[in-house]
Every structure is written in structure tokens, then in C-alpha cells.
């Protein structure tokens, strides 16, 4: 069993104003899924992108929107969860005055 605090995990800068912490992955003994903590600073846009795998999101703190090529498609606030299907173009924008934080789960075998 693994029990840690997120502050014990180093942050990786994804782009300016956005960091990612790999909380659980293969090196922690998880064979199937990775759990990541994403933090987006106020006013920052996570550039639209896509992946060949699904991912699941659960919003912890802050406010923002999920975007796709057509514009804003959903509000992000604590308690909201999002399923992003494989290869769907998506991005995020922090619309609040506090960091937007969410858990993002992805499969390790992709």
C-alpha cells in the first residue's frame, strides 16, 4: 500500500503556468492506471491537444472550462468529472482567480 502527500511528489512544468504531478504510476506499483494532479494557474490556457487513450478527470479546486475546437464545452468546478475519449481534441482554461486543480487518470498501457 502507498500513502503519500501530494507535496512529496515533484511537479513537472507542462507549459508556463501549468504543472503536473505523477501521484501514482508504474514505479509506485500500479500496473494499469496512472493518477496525476494537474494545476493550472489563473488565466492560463492548457493548449488544446489529444491522446490515443481516454482519460478521466475529477475537479478538486478552482473554476475553469473544458474546451474543444468549437469553443467552451463544459464548466470545471469542484465535484465535476469529465471523460475525454481517445483522440478527442481538448484543452482547459482557468477562468477563476485561484489555481484550478484536478485529478487526471490515464491507462498505463496505451
Where are these regions (language model features)?
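A generic "binding-loop/recognition-motif" signal
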Residues: 52-53, 72, 88-89, 98
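Short acidic-glycine-tyrosine-enriched beta hairpin
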Residues: 70-86
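Short strand-connecting beta-turns/loops that link adjacent beta-strands
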Residues: 28-29, 71, 97-98, 110
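A short, N-terminal "cap"/entry segment at the start of jelly-roll beta-barrel domains
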Residues: 1-32
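A short hydrophobic beta-strand segment most commonly corresponding to one strand
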Residues: 37, 56, 83, 98-110
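Conserved short histidine dyad/triad with adjacent acidic residue
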Residues: 21, 36-51, 86
Amino acid at each position: 500500500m502507498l500513502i503519500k502527500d501530494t507535496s512529496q511528489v515533484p511537479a513537472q512544468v507542462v507549459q508556463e503556468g501549468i504543472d503536473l504531478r505523477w501521484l501514482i504510476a508504474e514505479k509506485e506499483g500500479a500496473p494499469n492506471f496512472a493518477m496525476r494532479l494537474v494545476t493550472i494557474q489563473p488565466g492560463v490556457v492548457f493548449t488544446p491537444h489529444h491522446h490515443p487513450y481516454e482519460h478521466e478527470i475529477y475537479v478538486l479546486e478552482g473554476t475553469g472550462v473544458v474546451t474543444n475546437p468549437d469553443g467552451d464545452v463544459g464548466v470545471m468546478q469542484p465535484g465535476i468529472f469529465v471523460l475525454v475519449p481517445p483522440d478527442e481534441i481538448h484543452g482547459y482554461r482557468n477562468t477563476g482567480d485561484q489555481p484550478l486543480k484536478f485529478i487526471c487518470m490515464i491507462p498505463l498501457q496505451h
